[in-house]
Each structure stands twice: as C-alpha cells, then as structure tokens.
C-alpha cells in the first residue's frame, strides 16, 4: 500500500511535532477509521480491534510509521508488533484521553496549584482500565518534547508528547511503571536538540554520577507519624542538632549509612543528647557531593545516596517516634547549571533569568530563579508544601535569603540591574518569600520556617500584614560572628572586646532568633569551634565549656552542628565520618556530657526558653565588669518565680565573694556549673547552693569559677 505522507506526517517521523495526537492514533477517514502508529525498529505491526479482529498495518515510512484501517467500530484497540524475532502486544499511547483537565490547566496557568506535584512529573495511574504512567512537564518554548526511558529503549520518537495550556507537555505511557528510569528529550525553539533533562518534579533519581529520574508511586509512600504537638512554638524549647547525613557516622568500608540505618541510630542519639530538633543539610537530589546539597537538581527527590523515598519516610518517622522535630535546609535561591538540570530547560531561560546580571551567582557559579515568573514561583512554593505534606517535615530553614533579597548581592558596581523603582531590593523575590510563608503557615500552622539572613533587613520574622517577611525564626548571624570573635581572643585581651558580648542584646528581640553555630563555622579554614579556643589545653576546653553555657543561657533558640557537641578538633569534612573515637578521652566526653546537661536544663527550666524571643524574659545584672571579663543576667519565665541567674566568667581567674543582686531572698540552687569535674573542670563553685545575705536588698555572695558559667535558680 503506497501512502502519500503529509507535512504533518514528516513532522512526526522527524520528531518535531508539538501535538502528535493530531496525526498518530485513530482518526476518521473516508468513512472509516485509520490507525497511524510510530514504532521505530518494528518490522511488522498489526492492530487488534475491540471485537478481536486483526488487521495488518502497512509500513508508510522506514522510521517505523505504520498505517492501516481499524477493524470494527470501537475506538479501542491493541497493537501487536514484531521486533526481530520477538512479538509483543502493546497499547498505543495515542489512543488515550488527556491527563490534565481544563481546571488543572487553569490553575497551572494562574500559578496557584498548591499541589503541583500531584499533576506534574511522573504518576502511575490507570486510564480506561490500562495501567501505565502519566508524564507531564513544563517546557513552553520547546518545539518537541518526548519522554524516554526503560519502557521505550530511550528512543525519543516512541513517546512524543503533546503540549497543552501554556506549555505543559503530557503523555500517558501504557505499561510504564514505578521503578522505571526516564528523562525528557527536547527540541528547542529552533528545533535544536537539547541535552536530555531530568524531571524537575521527579520523586527519585539515580545515584550520581547517573542522572535519570525514577518513577515513584507516591500514593504508596508511608506517612510518618506526627511530631510532638507545639514543638515549634516560640515559648517551647528549641535546641537543633544540625546534621549532614553523609558524614555524621559511617560504616565499615567508609560507606554511607542508609536512611534506615540512620533511623536506627540518629534519633536515639539526638534524644539522648537532649536536642529537640534535628536539621538535615539539604536532602534534595544533587549531583556534587562537595556542594553538601546546596546545589540541588531535584527539589522533589530525597537524594538516592542513602536510599529510596520510602527509606527517607522511615527516618522522619523514627525521629518523630523519638520526640524529635525534623527541619530541612531548603534551597530556593539558586540551582546548578548541570546539563541535565533546570538551566536552559526548554532551550530558553525558563527557570532562571536570561541576563547573567540577574540570573547567575558570581560567588557560586549557579543560576538564580526568576521569581517574576508565575510558573517558577508555583514550582518553588509547591515544593515547600510537598516536604511538609508528603514527608511530614516540621519546618524549613531557607538558605541564603540575603542573596535573594538584594539584586546587587555580591556584585560589582554596574554589574546588576535595579528594580523598577531604581532600587537594589528584589521585589519579585520578596513577594515570593511572603507567599511561601503565607502558604506554609496557612496549610501547616504548626510548622515553622527559618531564614538564614545575614543583613539588617528588617522584620524578617515578623508577620506579613505588618510589613514583615513572615518567617518563624531568623538565624542570628551577628551574634555568631561577634561572640566567636570574642571567644577566640586571649582572655587578657577580651576586656577590649567586651562590647561584642553586650551588643547582641541591643537587638536580641527585634526578631525571633536562632543562635547558630552551624556547618559554615567549621569549614574552609575557620577551624572547628574547639579549634578557635585560645590558651593551653585546659583553657581551650574550659573556654569551650563556658562558651556553650553562655549560648544556652542567652536568649534565642539554639543550633549546633554535629561534632561540635563533643569538641571535634579538626574541621568538618563532608567525605568522612565524625571523629567519634575522641569520646574515648575524658576531655571530649566531658564536653558531650556538658551539652547533654545544658539541653536538659534548657528544656526543664521555663526561665531559659519560655520567653526566648521576648524582652520581658531577660534582664542584665552586670554589664560593666570588663576587667574581669564577667557578665551576669537574669532569665525569666511566665511564672513570677521562674527565674534563672546566669553568670559567665570569660577570664581564667577565680573570683571570691562576688556580689550579685537577685529578686528573691532565701536559698538559690546552683543547678549548673560548667567547671564541674564531670565535664573536665576544676570543681570550683558554690557547693550546690547559696543563701542571700542579710540586708534590705537580696544579694548573693558567690564564688565564680575560672573560664566558666554558673546557673542558679531560687528554691520554691
């Protein structure tokens, strides 16, 4: 049978048709129904009608185009194809109805689909009684998009997709299933072949260096149990253990622990240490280990380094079972330019800005999201909701917020483009951040968000309706820089830097602050936290004990990076385990015991956490004793007698009969002393309790241990 091919037929055969459904499949023709099938490498094809009748199709083009009449009146049919010596029966993807409804297209076009991940990506489903996978991807400027994978020999002609709405390409692939590997094969605006792309909405990906996406049936994922109620409240204790999953601990052969192995070990350790939360460095899929996850290519996929999405669910569930909240580092500020990723996705700057003065980070060599694009904002906002809904995550810490807020962030003069008012503020990014926080708290009111924001941008953690950005918390980067600078000085010089301890309290309640000693402070030549401590060996460890006690007595929630809790000597390395063997030595196990007791005290004393973010919870008592490097303040809870006196001595001297006024007469209990012998100290202190002196004003006469902090509470 000789078939005269149309231009449309050639467009399909050559892989440049935007809607192959217009040509392929069953179509009325000359009073009957013609079936057109494109099956590359097939040597013969038959069509089987719904009534069981079989008719051969003629090969109309050597690329694998077969054409012939459909037997019977029903539009349903099956194909039988021979590939060499193998004959298979298969369904024609071009006989099935669309995946996206008109309402789906409306929400996607409007950018308000909060469950974007239920529509885009790869979803196992059943259409007209046939099992398969529905694939949907955004590529508005592509000339042609195909899905390629294990189900079609990675041949881009086999499953060419159709475009609908404002650039959403879709196709139901019969016979594809969960576990299949796939990518999208695109022709750009001018018909040029683009690098094959991983699915931006994939729920799983291959282990690097491979880059294919993996079909996951998200409906079968177990739901982690919820975290303890109100674990993120401003009045609740929040002590966060920050963890890089690949280097917390390793097994024999220097191999990563899997999510399930981590689930058996990490939550128990975090609970034993008294932390309330664990914060994972980004778990979204990323190609380069050395980025620590901060250059993600798969925002919707837990990295395959440690297992499957089901395995990640098990880790979250184990944390919640141990009473631990789970926070994820989330990276909506930039992404890498790996060929299989989001960059130049459809042959144009789809997710990023086209102009490198807006679209590329000079520091990191990464691309910047275009927050002025409706589809991009929808993609990012839905991703935040995805982690909270699908995996039961309790909070998101947003990375590098300052780089999002300022158009001139780390750019030279003349190397950036002002906003429409001529200013440096990124108006679209600000709108996105506010929308993100609105959506998160609207859908998950007991969750939280935290901003890593290093500038003086006002009201980061204040309500949007009052002009704020809407975050729950802000990392206090100023406190971290000032206090680490102070503690790194030899005690003899600290009196000249006394203000670095005092200054943070001038703004301590302008935001809801988290005090971070994060991964960023123990890498790139900064040394470990212990490595910053001056003096001989005893002084180094005493300084560290005093500094940690100072941190836990200071207003604000707490965050400590793994390894710091036992005084790791060396800088953190992402490609090896923490130095757990150090705990064989008392000076390191003493630091660990100190952190465990500080966490316990912080959680048990309302005065230390109830008004963490409220100026009524803090009162300076001694600020001007610079010559002694000594500070004292009162922490307060809601109850009148919920009080905790904190005294920190950053000098190596012991001070006898040191007088401090207190609000209540009677006995005050020394509930914590960082100079305890159990922590490696000298056991100088007040014997566990002290009574106020006789007089009109209650006053304590105290013995202040060297390079140490003591906490005292009034007896009931």
UniProtKB/Swiss-Prot annotation:
Pathway: Glycan biosynthesis; glycogen biosynthesis. GO terms for molecular function: 1,4-alpha-glucan branching enzyme activity; cation binding; hydrolase activity, hydrolyzing O-glycosyl compounds. SUPFAM superfamilies: (Trans)glycosidases, E set domains, Glycosyl hydrolase domain. It is an enzyme of class 2 (transferase). The keyword Cell membrane does not apply. Keywords: Carbohydrate metabolism, Glycogen biosynthesis, Glycogen metabolism, Glycosyltransferase, Transferase. The active site is at 399 (nucleophile), 452 (proton donor). InterPro entries: A-amylase/branching_C, Branching_enzy, GlgB, GlgB_N, GlgB_N_E_set_prok, Glyco_hydro_13_cat_dom, Glyco_hydro_13_N, Glyco_hydro_b. It catalyses: Transfers a segment of a (1->4)-alpha-D-glucan chain to a primary hydroxy group in a similar glucan chain. Its EC number is 2.4.1.18. GO terms for cellular component: cytosol. GO terms for biological process: glycogen biosynthetic process. Belongs to the glycosyl hydrolase 13 family. GlgB subfamily. Catalyzes the formation of the alpha-1,6-glucosidic linkages in glycogen by scission of a 1,4-alpha-linked oligosaccharide from growing alpha-1,4-glucan chains and the subsequent attachment of the oligosaccharide to the alpha-1,6 position. Monomer. This is 1,4-alpha-glucan branching enzyme GlgB. It comes from Rhodopseudomonas palustris (strain ATCC BAA-98 / CGA009). The gene is glgB.
């Amino acid at each position: 049978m000789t078939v005269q091919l149309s231009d449309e037929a050639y467009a399909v055969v050559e892989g440049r048709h935007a809607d192959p459904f217009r040509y392929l499949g069953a179509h009325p023709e000359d009073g009957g129904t013609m079936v057109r099938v494109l099956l590359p490498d097939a040597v013969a094809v038959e069509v089987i009608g719904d009534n069981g009748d079989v008719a051969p199709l003629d090969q109309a083009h050597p690329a694998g185009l077969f054409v012939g009449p459909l037997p019977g009146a029903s539009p349903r049919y099956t194909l039988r194809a021979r590939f060499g010596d193998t004959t298979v029966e298969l369904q024609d993807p071009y006989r099935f109805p669309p995946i996206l409804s008109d309402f789906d297209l409306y929400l996607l076009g409007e950018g308000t689909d909060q469950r974007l991940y239920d529509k885009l990506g790869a979803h196992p489903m059943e259409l007209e009684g046939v099992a398969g996978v529905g694939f949907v991807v955004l590529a508005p400027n592509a000339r042609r998009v195909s899905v390629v994978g294990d189900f079609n020999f990675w041949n881009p002609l086999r499953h060419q997709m159709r475009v609908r709405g404002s650039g959403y390409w879709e196709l139901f692939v019969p016979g594809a299933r969960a576990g299949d590997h796939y990518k999208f094969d695109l022709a750009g605006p001018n018909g040029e072949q683009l690098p094959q792309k991983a699915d931006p909405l994939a729920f799983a990906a291959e282990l690097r260096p491979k880059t294919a996406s993996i079909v996951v049936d998200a409906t079968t994922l177990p739901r982690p149990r919820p975290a303890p109620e109100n674990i993120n409240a401003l009045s609740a204790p929040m002590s966060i253990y920050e963890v890089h999953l690949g280097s917390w601990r390793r097994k024999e052969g220097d191999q990563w622990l899997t999510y399930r192995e981590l689930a058996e070990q990490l939550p128990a350790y975090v609970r034993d240490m008294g932390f309330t939360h664990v914060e994972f460095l980004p778990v979204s899929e990323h190609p380069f280990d050395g980025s620590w996850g901060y250059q993600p290519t798969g925002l919707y996929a837990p990295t395959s380094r440690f297992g499957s999405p089901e395995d990640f669910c098990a880790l979250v569930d184990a944390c919640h079972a141990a009473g631990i909240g789970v926070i994820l580092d989330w990276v909506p500020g930039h992404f890498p330019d790996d060929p299989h990723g989001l960059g130049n996705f459809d042959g144009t700057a789809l997710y990023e800005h086209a102009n490198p003065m807006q679209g590329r980070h000079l520091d990191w060599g990464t691309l910047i999201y275009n927050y002025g694009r409706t589809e991009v904002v929808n993609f990012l906002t839905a991703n935040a909701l995805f982690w909270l809904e699908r995996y039961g995550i309790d909070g998101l810490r947003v990375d590098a917020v300052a780089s999002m807020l300022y158009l001139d962030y780390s750019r030279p003069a003349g190397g950036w483009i002002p906003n429409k008012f001529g200013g440096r503020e990124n108006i679209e990014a600000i709108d996105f951040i506010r929308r993100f926080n609105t959506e998160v708290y609207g859908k998950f009111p007991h969750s939280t968000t935290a901003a890593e924001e290093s500038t003086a941008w006002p009201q980061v953690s204040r309500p949007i309706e009052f002009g704020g950005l809407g975050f729950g918390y802000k990392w206090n980067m100023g406190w971290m820089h000032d206090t680490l600078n102070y503690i790194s000085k030899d005690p003899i010089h600290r009196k000249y830097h006394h203000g670095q301890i005092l200054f943070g309290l001038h703004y301590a309640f302008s935001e809801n602050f988290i005090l971070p000693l994060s991964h960023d402070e123990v890498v790139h030549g900064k040394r470990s936290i212990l490595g910053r401590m001056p003096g001989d060996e005893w002084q180094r460890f005493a300084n560290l004990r005093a500094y940690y006690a100072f941190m836990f007595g200071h207003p604000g929630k707490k965050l400590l990076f793994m390894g710091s809790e036992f005084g790791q000597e060396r800088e953190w390395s992402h490609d090896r385990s923490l130095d757990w063997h150090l705990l064989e030595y008392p000076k390191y196990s003493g630091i660990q015991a100190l952190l465990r007791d500080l966490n316990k005290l912080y959680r048990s004393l309302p005065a230390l956490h109830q008004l963490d973010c409220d100026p009524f919870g803090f009162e300076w008592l001694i600020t001007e004793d610079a010559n002694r490097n000594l500070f004292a303040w009162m922490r307060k809870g809601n109850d009148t007698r919920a009080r905790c006196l904190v005294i920190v001595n950053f000098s190596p001297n012991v001070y006898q009969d040191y007088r401090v006024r207190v609000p209540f007469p009677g006995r005050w209990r020394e509930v914590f002393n960082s100079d305890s012998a159990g922590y490696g100290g000298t056991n100088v202190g007040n014997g566990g309790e002290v009574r106020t002196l006789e007089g009109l004003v209650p006053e304590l006469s105290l013995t202040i241990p060297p390079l140490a902090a003591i906490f005292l509470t009034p007896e009931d």
